[in-house]
Amino acid sequence: MSEPFGIVAGALNVAGLFNNCVDCFEYVQLGRPFGRDYERCQLRLDIAKARLSRWGEAVKINDDPRFHSDAPTDKSVQLAKSIVEEILLLFESAQKTSKRYELVADQQDLVVFEDKDMKPIGRALHRRLNDLVSRRQKQTSLAKKTAWALYDGKSLEKIVDQVARFVDELEKAFPIEAVCHKLAEIEIEEVEDEASLTILKDAAGGIDAAMSDAAAQKIDAIVGRNSAKDIRTEERARVQLGNVVTAAALHGGIRISDQTTNSVETVVGKGESRVLIGNEYGGKGFWDN
C-alpha cells in the first residue's frame, strides 16, 4: 500500500474503505520460506478475504446509502468504519514488517510463489475464491497499491486470525448470521468433489466457521452414501467405511464427484483381511502395508 493510510481513510466513506480493504488481499504474495505450507496458507488468505467480502455482500455495502455517507450517524455503521480502518492498519503493519525483513534477508529467501506452484485442486479453489470476490467488488480502489510479500507463517496467521476476529465483530453489529451462512453455501455449491471440499474445510478451520460447516455438510452427504449395519473384526482385520482419497489423488489433481452408493448388512473381518465400504481414488492408500 503505497498511499499513507491517513490519506486513504480520510478520503473515503465506509463503502470505499471496505472495498480498499478487500483489495489489500490481492497484493499479498507469499515467499519461498512457506515451503510446503504455501498452498494451505494461500487458501487461508483467500478464505479470510472471501469471508470479509461475504459480510459486505450480506449488508449490501455497495448499495445501502448508510455506507456511502461521509459522516455516518448510524452507530453500527460508525463501528463498521472503525473496524475496517483497523484491518487496513493491520495490512500496513504487516507490510512494514516484511520490508524490514527484506533489508536483511538473502536474495534467495525473497523469491515468491506463483499460482502455477499450486497443485491443480488448490489452484482451482484459489481461482474460484478470487473470482467470487471479484464479482462482488463494485467499486474501484482509489489507493495505489503495489504487490508485497509475507515471508513467515506467523505473520500470515496474525492477519487471517485478526481479520476473522474483526469480521466476528462486524457480523455481531448487523443481524445477518443466516444470510452469511446461506452465502457460504452458495460460494461452494459448484464444488462437488470430496478432495476439494476436504481441503476447503481444513483451510477454513478457525477463521470461517460458515464455510467450514458448509464444506463438512457436503462431505457428510457424500460419505453418507456408504453404510454398514453391523461390522465385526477379529485379530488384525481392518474395515474402512467411507471413501479413501489418497495423497496421490490430491497431488495429481484428480477431481472426485462421487455419486455412488455402497451399502452392506454385515461385515465380518478376520486375520489380515481388509474391507473397504466405499471407493478409493488415487494410488496406494488404505490398502498399504
UniProtKB/Swiss-Prot annotation:
**GO CC entries:** cytoplasm
Which residue ranges are recorded for the region named Prion domain (PrD)?
A: 218-289
Output the InterPro entries linked to this UniProt entry.
Answer: HeLo_dom, HeLo_sf, Het-s_prion_dom
**Which keywords describe this protein according to UniProt?**
Amyloid, Cytoplasm, Prion
Location in or out of the cell: Cytoplasm
Question: Primary place of residence?
Answer: cytoplasm
- Recorded consequence of changing D23A: Converts its specificity to [Het-S]
Report the GO molecular function annotations.
Answer: identical protein binding
User: Origin, by domain of life?
Assistant: Eukaryota
What segment(s) does the record annotate as region Globular domain? 1-227
Q: How does it assemble?
A: Homodimer. Forms heterodimers with het-S.
User: What does the record's free text say on domains?
Assistant: The globular domain is dispensable for prion formation and incompatibility function. However, the het-S globular domain, but not the het-s globular domain, is essential for programmed cell death.
Record's miscellaneous remark: [Het-s] is the prion form of het-s. [Het-s] is the result of a conformational change of the cellular het-s protein that becomes self-propagating and infectious. This conformational change generates a form of het-S that assembles into amyloid fibrils. [Het-s] is transmitted as a non-Mendelian cytoplasmic element. On vegetative cell fusion with neutral [Het-s*] strains, the prion spreads throughout the cellular network and converts the non-prion form of het-s to a prion state, making the strains acquire the [het-s] phenotype. Interacts with het-S to trigger incompatibility. In P.anserina, the het-s locus exists as 2 incompatible alleles, het-s and het-S. Strains of het-s genotype (e.g. A, C, s, and V) can display 2 distinct phenoypes, the neutral (prion-free) [Het-s*], which is compatible with het-S strains (e.g. D, S, U, and X), and the reactive [Het-s] phenotype, which causes rapid cell death in het-S strains. Although the two alleles het-s and het-S differ from each other by 14 amino acids, vegetative incompatibility between s and S strains can be attributed to a single amino acid difference in the proteins encoded by the het-s locus.
Sum up the protein's function in the record's words: Responsible for heterokaryon incompatibility, a process that ensures that during spontaneous, vegetative cell fusion only compatible cells from the same colony survive (non-self-recognition). Forms a prion for the non-Mendelian trait [het-s]. Interacts with het-S from incompatible cells to trigger a lethal reaction that prevents the formation of viable heterokaryons. It is unknown if the native, soluble protein has a cellular function.
What name does this protein carry?
Heterokaryon incompatibility protein s
What organism is recorded for this protein?
Podospora anserina (Pleurage anserina)
Source organism phylogeny: Eukaryota, Fungi, Dikarya, Ascomycota, Pezizomycotina
